[in-house]
């Protein structure tokens, strides 16, 4: 897992789960979430 992935898991498990289902990269999701 990337540092971002771990951070998401620690903050909210839904983010990590959604990434797996959507197949979105951790970095991409991080950018979208930050926006």
From Swiss-Prot:
What organism is this sequence from? Heliofungia actiniformis (Mushroom coral)
Q: What is its main location?
A: other
- So what does this one do? Peptide with unknown function. Does not exhibit antimicrobial activity against Escherichia coli and Staphylococcus aureus.
UniProt KW keywords: Nematocyst, Secreted
Q: Which residues pair up as cystines? A: none
Q: Return the protein name.
A: Peptide Hact-3
Q: Cellular location of this protein?
A: Nematocyst; Secreted
Gene Ontology cellular-component terms listed: extracellular region; nematocyst
Tissue expression summary: Expressed in tentacles.
Q: Would the keyword Protein transport be found if you checked this record's keyword annotation?
A: no
